[in-house]
UniProtKB/Swiss-Prot annotation:
Its EC number is 2.5.1.7. The keyword Transferase applies. It catalyses: phosphoenolpyruvate + UDP-N-acetyl-alpha-D-glucosamine = UDP-N-acetyl-3-O-(1-carboxyvinyl)-alpha-D-glucosamine + phosphate. This is UDP-N-acetylglucosamine 1-carboxyvinyltransferase. It is found in: Cytoplasm. Phosphoenolpyruvate binds at residues 22-23. Gene3D superfamilies: Enolpyruvate transferase domain (3.65.10.10). The gene is murA. The lineage of its organism: Bacteria, Pseudomonadati, Pseudomonadota, Alphaproteobacteria, Rhodobacterales. InterPro entries: Enolpyruvate_Tfrase_dom (IPR001986), Enolpyruvate_Tfrase_sf (IPR036968), MurA_subfamily (IPR050068), RNA3'P_cycl/enolpyr_Trfase_a/b (IPR013792), UDP_GlcNAc_COvinyl_MurA (IPR005750). Its main location: cytoplasm.
């Protein structure tokens, strides 16, 4: 099993290109199941989760070709051979559930295993299922699988009011609604850029959608969808992660393809901590102002609030801030599993339920640490960049699910980092 070796204590200077958004691409790929015409995605990230979704779609009979080194995906579902998404594939990634709505909407039936993925608290699929039930689907959970059937004549438009904001449930309902009979209104819908990106792609395919980016999305169902070519939106989580690298280490880095509107609430916290963020012609330039980073309080919220997927990385920054910071996690349970690993590096962190209290220290110390999930893995790498001595991060297979070429991108800016094959 591979690990990452980081030698800290140096400034970073240079440019880092930001990839297409993993979370957007994982929703866009199943959209091919809605049509028998080709869907081409450009600016696709090259990640293990994308390969898992490719494997899942191919198991259903879809064709997926990876072109231009993986940056272009050519998909076609003109002749599905199966409507069963097996546990052996689905268990690897929670986004696998996103094949349910499209298959049900287009062909009227689907069998999908309950998903796996990151071990972060309770992330139930109930919201997905209730949305599809509102459209008339008959659902039966047995033997670890969701058995779904559409009513005679197909799914029906409906009013779907989500009790809590859910990105995945919004995506599944949005895709299903494009082929439902009549009008579907999604209330308390997720507003993330990935939702907007999916809606734009579906509209290119012929869907009639209004209101994406707001809490209410209206979909007028159509009889069929066509093909399209669509660029995957910039990955705001990768963007925020690499913005923290010069914030933690010092120096100045330009993030190519970055846009303020993708990370507005995050930028506000960086500014309060003493980090400069400037727009450039090609992206964003980030530098730490003079002196030590200042403590700030952070509460994770659905977009446009502070993203939960940047909480672990932000904690790495605040471990060496002047003063005490309070981080409140309101999206997922049990999402401070990186805290004990950071304390091995000398961080002072107290966790009580969904709140972490971080008292900054002047320096972290390198240590052997273990990644517990995707975002925790990169937070430990960031901490290692600022620590004295060497840090070895094990179980980095988590990292490969969400970050492409992380060692290359950081070493190009002067970081001492390399992968140790397992």
């Amino acid at each position: 099993m591979d690990s990452i070796l980081v030698k800290g204590n140096g400034e970073l200077r240079g440019q880092i290109p930001i990839a297409g958004a993993k979370n957007a691409c994982l929703a866009l790929m199943p959209a091919t199941l809605l049509s028998d015409e080709p869907l081409t995605l450009t600016n696709a990230p090259r990640l293990s989760d994308i390969r898992t979704m490719t494997q899942l779609l191919q198991s259903l009979g879809a064709e997926v070709a990876s072109l231009q080194g993986g940056q272009v995906l050519a998909l076609s579902s003109h002749a599905l051979t199966d409507h069963r998404a097996d546990y052996d594939i689905v268990r690897k990634m929670r986004a696998s559930i996103l094949v349910l709505g499209p298959m049900l909407a287009r062909d009227g039936h689907a069998v999908v295993s309950l998903p796996g993925g990151c071990a972060i608290g309770a992330r139930p699929v109930d919201l997905h299922l209730k949305a599809l039930e509102a459209m008339g689907a008959d659902l039966d959970l047995r033997d670890g699988y969701i058995h779904a059937k559409a009513p005679a004549g197909g799914l029906r438009g409906a009013r779907v009011a989500f009790p809590i904001v859910s990105v995945g449930a919004t995506e599944n309902a949005l895709m299903a609604a494009t082929l439902a009979k009549g009008t579907t209104v999604l209330e308390n819908a997720a507003r993330e850029p990935e939702i907007v990106d999916l809606a734009r792609c579906l509209r290119r395919m012929g869907a009639q959608i209004e209101g994406e980016g707001s809490a209410t999305i209206t979909v007028q169902g159509v009889d069929r969808l066509g093909g399209a070519t669509h660029p995957v939106v910039t990955d705001r989580i990768e963007l925020g992660t690499y913005m923290l690298a010069p914030a933690i280490c010092g120096g100045e880095v330009e993030l190519l393809g970055g846009r303020i509107e993708l990370v507005g609430a995050f930028c506000e916290k960086l500014d309060a901590a003493g980090i400069s963020v400037e727009e450039t012609e090609r992206g964003l330039r980030v530098a730490r102002r003079n002196g030590r980073v200042k403590a700030v309080d952070v509460t994770t919220e659905p977009f446009p609030g502070f993203p939960t997927d940047l909480q672990a990385q932000m904690m790495a920054l605040l471990c060496t801030a002047e003063g005490t910071s309070v981080l409140e996690e309101k999206i997922f349970e049990n999402r401070f599993m990186h805290a004990p690993e950071l304390t091995r590096m000398g961080a002072r962190i107290e966790v009580h339920g969904g709140t972490a209290r971080v008292t900054g220290v002047e320096k972290l110390r390198g240590a052997p640490v273990m990644a517990t999930d995707l975002r925790a893995s990169v937070s430990l790498i960031l901490a290692g960049l600022a620590a004295e001595g060497e840090t070895v991060v094990s179980r980095v297979y988590h990292l490969d699910r969400g970050y492409e070429r992380v060692e290359e991108k950081l070493s190009a800016c002067g970081a001492q980092i390399r992968r140790i094959p397992g």
